[in-house]
Amino acid sequence: MTKLSKRQQQILEFIKQEVKTKGYPPSVREIGEAVGLASSSTVHGHLARLESKGYIRRDPTKPRAIEILDNDMAKEREKEEIISVPIIGKVTAGQPITAVENIEGYFPLPKRLAAGEEQLFMLEVMGDSMIEAGILDGDYVIVRQQSSANNGDIVVAMTEDNEATVKRFFKEKDHIRLQPENAHLEPIIVRDCTILGKVIGVYRLFD
């Protein structure tokens, strides 16, 4: 097993104790209070490392879904290199997309599925504007950070109104068309927009 830092060991032991005594894992806030960490983002970072090392497994859509892995499962996960992809809860104009205050958590992604990309983030999709591209309400898109796009790329873009949106990108004569993949919706026409990244994958939970 990959060696844990002192703080990671403290967090792991606290989670084990809470599950043993209460029957369910602690929240991020409770973990922070127990080990003396005021920042929830710092706790998320430690949990991501525990997950990448194969000690726990989390469900990013549920606040308390932390599962302690047994040794066999942990050893199996240790064989495969995992990267921690930040899940962005909000997009703020003028800030880097992965600024700490924007991060809600981390998602463990096998490196082989990242196509060699390092600068990734994930964003929850709200609405049905991209359903004809197979991106549904509640899906998480996996996004490669980049500031430019080719016509036809599905991107995360920040519009002039400082709204982040997932659309297909088209640069036309004197404007940019952000095209939904839904026949019932009209495109967004803007003079300019900021490209935050290109969508390279989708993560979905089935009921």
UniProtKB/Swiss-Prot annotation:
Name of encoding gene: lexA
Lineage, opening ranks: Bacteria, Bacillati, Bacillota, Bacilli, Bacillales
Pfam family for this entry, one: LexA_DNA_bind
Broad enzyme group: hydrolase
Record keywords: Autocatalytic cleavage, DNA damage, DNA repair, DNA replication, DNA-binding, Hydrolase, Repressor, SOS response, Transcription, Transcription regulation
Keyword hit for Repressor: yes
Quaternary structure, from the entry: Homodimer.
SUPFAM superfamilies: LexA/Signal peptidase (SSF51306), Winged helix' DNA-binding domain (SSF46785)
Provenance organism: Geobacillus kaustophilus (strain HTA426)
InterPro entries found in the cross-reference section: ArsR-like_HTH, LexA, LexA-like, LexA/Signal_pep-like_sf, LexA_DNA-bd_dom, LexA_repressor, Peptidase_S24_LexA, Peptidase_S24_S26A/B/C
Protein name: LexA repressor
